[in-house]
Amino acid sequence: MTKTLEDRIIKLEETVYFQEKTISELNDALTQQQLQLDEMHKLQQAVEIKLRQMAPLLRDADAGDDGPPPHYL
């Protein structure tokens, strides 16, 4: 094998190594983001449930305020 061919092969091997390393790091980051997204989705669902539970209470509280505000009296 000639020196230039050997150098080219070494360069290609280095490139493949760094690409594989980058792909692995990106995969780790994507996995972490998906876990965070799943957690945020669970929290959003919990907030929606709480809001649905509170909606009747808020409507009932608003129903009693039919009179004029105190500063109009």
Curated annotation (Swiss-Prot):
Protein name: Protein SlyX homolog
Organism in which the protein naturally occurs: Oleidesulfovibrio alaskensis (strain ATCC BAA-1058 / DSM 17464 / G20) (Desulfovibrio alaskensis)
Organism classification: Bacteria, Pseudomonadati, Thermodesulfobacteriota, Desulfovibrionia, Desulfovibrionales
Family classification: Belongs to the SlyX family.
Listed InterPro entries: SlyX
Parts of the chain that traverse the membrane: none
